[in-house]
Amino acid sequence: MSKQTDKTSQIVLSTPLSILSGGGEPICSLATQPSGAIGVIRVSGEKAIEVTDKVFHGVRGKHLTDAKGNTLHYGEILDKEGKTIDDVLVSVFRAPHSYTGENSTEISCHGSAYILNQVVKALIDAGCRQAQPGEYTQRAYMNGKMDLSQAEAVADLIAASNRATHQVALSQLKGHFSSELSLLREQLLKMTSLLELELDFSDHEELEFADRTELKALAETIHQKIKLLTDSFETGKALKKGVPVAIVGKTNVGKSTLLNCLLHEEKAIVSNIHGTTRDVIEDTTEIKGVTFRFIDTAGIRHTDDQIEKLGIERAYQKMDEAAIVLWVIDEQPTAEECTEMQRLAKGKHLIAIFNKIDSKEIERKLLNDELPTVFISAKLKQNITALEEAIYEAADIPEISENSVIITSARHYEALTHADESILRVIEALDFGLSGDLVSEDLRICLHQLADITGGQITPHEVLGNIFKHFCIGK
C-alpha cells in the first residue's frame, strides 16, 4: 500500500482547537429579540451548567448540577446581591447532546429588554463571557455536530425570506449537499488509491491496478455531477437575491401602475404626464414562494431633458442586468420595434405586455411565435394572475423541496469550479496517456477543493472568522 498519507481524510487545523473554539469556556447571549413575550438566553461551555447554577435558585433547593440532560427546571434567577431578577424555566443539555456539542443551558424568562440584560449581566458576573457572533454554531462545527457547509446553512435558514430559500437552506442543513460531496469524495479516493498503488509498484511496469478506460468513465461521471452543482448556482443566486425583472417601455404606457399592481402597494408615482418616472424604482414580492425583484424604469423616448436622459440610460442598464424583461406596450408595435426590443433583451426572457385593454380596442394576437404576450389592464388589475404565471414560468425555477441541492454560496461555487477544472485535467491526462503520478496530483487537488466546502482539511482561522462573523449573536 502507499506510504503517503491521504491528508484529505483528516481534519488538520492550522490554528489550535482551543483558540478557535475558546477552549470550551462558558459563553452566554440572547437567543431571541428583546421586548417579546418570552426571551431566551443561551449558555454553552464545559462549565455552562455550573455557572448557570450559581445564579439559579430552584424550587425546593434543587441544583442544576444534579440535573439530567434534556430536562426542564423552574426557579428564579438572582443577581450577585441575591435579589430576584425573574421567574424562569431552565433547560439543561449535557454534552454531546446539545446544539454546540457542549454542556448547555437555555434560560426562558419574560422578554423585557431590562430583564434579559440583567440575566446576562448576572451570568457574566458568575463567570460567563459574552458570545461573539456565530460562536455557538462555530463551536458546533468544531465539535463535529455539523460540517462547514451545514454551519453556513444555519445563517441561510435564519435569513430565509421565502419558501424557496427556506427549503434550500433546510436541505443543506440536513446534509443533502454534504452527502453529494461525500459520494464524490469516495469516488475520487478510489481513483487516487488505485493510482498511488501503482506508484508503489513502479518497478514492475507490467502492473496496472487502475484500468484507464474505467478511470476516464468515472472521471467523466464526477465532472457531470460537479457541473450539475455549479449550474445550479444561477438559480441559487436568484432565489437568494430575488429574480431581477425589468419593466421597460415607452412613456405613459402604464409601467408604474403595473409595478404597483405587482407589489400590491402604491410604490411608484402614477401620472398622465410623460416622463414622470425619471429614476429606477425597485422592490420585491413573492410569486409561488419565489422572490422577484421588480425594477420600474424611466420611459424610453427621445428627450432633451438631461435628468430624464440619465433615467433612460439606467433603464438600459437595468435591462441588461435583468433575467426577465417585461415590455409594456399599449398599441401594436411595428416589426422594427419588435426586432429592436428582442435585440436589447437578447439572452433574457422577454414578455410583451399589452396594457390598457379596458380602454382600447386591441387586436389580441401574438407579436410573433417566439415572444410570449399577455393582455392586461394594470389599472383594473385584469389578467394579473396570468401575468404572474408567465413571469414565474420565465424564471424557470425547478421544483424545490427540502431534498433539493442548489448552490447559493459563492464560496461553494468557486471551490466546485476549481474542482471541476482539476477533474477535466484528469480526463485530458488520461486521454493523452500521461503517467499515474500526474493524474493523481490533479485528483488530490480536486479532493482538496471539495473538502474546502465542508471544512474537512486545513482551514485557516481567517476563513472560519470570515464565515462566522456574518452570523447574529446568539447563533
Q: Can you annotate each of these PLM segments?
A:
Residues 7-30, 163-286, 303-305, 334-475:
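C-terminal-of-GTPase-core extension/linker across diverse P-loop GTPases
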Residues 308-331:
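Inter-motif core of Ras-like GTPase G domains
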Residues 74-86, 90-94, 275-303, 321:
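Switch I (G2) and immediately adjacent beta-strands of P-loop GTPase domains
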Residues 1-167, 171, 175, 351:
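A glycine-rich (often HGG/GG-containing) alpha/beta subdomain
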Residues 294, 328, 353:
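Generic enzyme active-site microenvironment
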Residues 263, 298-299, 323, 330-331, ...:
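Short glycine-/small-residue-rich Rossmann-like dinucleotide-binding loops
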